Amino acid sequence: MTRRRRRSSARSNPSAWKADGLMASILLVSGPNLNLLGEREPEIYGRDTLDELVGDARAVAEANGHSLDHVQSNHEGEIVDAVQEARDRCAAIVINPGAFTHYSYALADALAAFEGPKIELHLSNPSAREAWRRTSVVAPVVTGTVAGFGRHGYRLALEAAVTLLKEDG
């Protein structure tokens, strides 16, 4: 029999972070092919590298008293693991699921199990692209979506997460 570890209330309840003097950690997840940003289809995704976008996100988090953890993977299971592990250590998740947006029910289930704010992020606007990109299996389980703002989306998504954490705290 597998026994689930009980979660600490300070870690699972974003409002308890401030009361316990803990700096909230925000998880930024980058899905498949995002490691190629700056090289792959720059006319759609821009010329900024993933490192530059993560730097922008980290600056927003730190300016608001939070830390930022970043995970990038081209493998669905690794991303699901990162989201599950965030349940014990992060107050919010910002995720650019890439192509997993459209078919990863495993990722959607992992996100649904996370109690804090969850922001779906896309550099381009999937609704303005090919028909197969217009479906998000992640959207029903996240707090909100930031899409189509290019590099500004990373800052906007982090600002949304920070704002939601402040409202919960």
Mark where each language-model region is.
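Short beta->alpha junction loops
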Residues: 67-77
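Short, glycine-/small-residue-rich phosphate/pyrophosphate-handling segment
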Residues: 128-169
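Short Gly/Thr/Asp-enriched flexible loops that form oxyanion-binding sites at enzyme active sites
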Residues: 85, 104-116
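Glycine- and acidic-residue-enriched helix-capping/strand-helix junction motifs
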Residues: 37-51
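Short acidic/histidine-rich motifs immediately flanking catalytic phosphotransfer sites
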Residues: 86-93
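Short, acidic/small-residue loops that bind anionic groups at enzyme active sites
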Residues: 112-129
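Extreme N-terminal starter segment of soluble prokaryotic enzymes
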Residues: 23-26
